[in-house]
């Protein structure tokens, strides 16, 4: 477990339309629970990379971009399968603002983690839209956080984004731990090491 008496916290910036954010949630939550460290999910809206199709005549740059995108997509599917997660939704052109506002509401009511898991699961299994206010409200109500009022929370969403960017966040998933910033769940071993007080060998 983490060192007693220390005010450790894991802050994780996520976007519901970002598959890497979904893949990071389970392992991060499990580690936080094991170490007894609070996990705070923070909304950060991002752009979605578009997977381009092969054309008969491609420039070298176009081909390299396509190959990278194809590898990225295959990599996501590989790790999703290991976690038994569905990744069937198309995130291209999706506006996640409403779902991120729901996360702010869920955080205020103490159900942010369960809300995020539910939204990720439903969206990526293609059973809900991220801009569906009714679905978001229903999830929050089921979790004991009724009365979702998105209109009053846009300013807070912008404030959270500005604060995160001032701390070095530029994408998702990104971790803010012990005054340091890490991009991607591949840094979880290092984050664990920091939270354990650097008592073990450096995980590199």
Predicted regions and their residues:
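Structural alpha/beta surface segment adjacent to cysteine/selenocysteine redox centers
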Residues: 23-123
């Amino acid at each position: 477990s983490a060192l007693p008496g220390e005010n450790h916290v894991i802050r994780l910036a996520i976007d519901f339309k970002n598959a890497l954010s979904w893949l990071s949630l389970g392992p991060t939550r499990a580690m936080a629970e094991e170490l007894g460290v609070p996990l705070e999910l923070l909304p950060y809206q991002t752009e979605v990379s578009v997977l381009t199709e092969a054309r008969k005549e491609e420039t070298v740059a176009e081909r390299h971009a396509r190959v990278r995108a194809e590898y990225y997509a295959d990599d996501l599917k590989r790790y999703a399968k290991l976690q038994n997660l569905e990744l069937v939704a198309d995130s291209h052109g999706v506006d996640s603002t409403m779902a991120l506002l729901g996360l702010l509401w869920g955080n205020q009511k103490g159900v942010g983690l369960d809300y995020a898991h539910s939204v990720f699961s439903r969206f990526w299994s293609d059973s809900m839209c991220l801009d569906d206010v009714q679905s978001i409200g229903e999830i929050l109500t089921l979790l004991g956080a009724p009365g979702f009022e998105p209109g009053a929370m846009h300013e807070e969403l912008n404030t959270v984004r500005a604060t995160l960017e001032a701390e070095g966040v530029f994408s998702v998933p990104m971790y803010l731990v012990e005054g340091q910033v890490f991009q991607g769940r591949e840094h979880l071993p290092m984050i664990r090491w920091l939270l354990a007080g650097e008592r073990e060998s450096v995980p590199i």
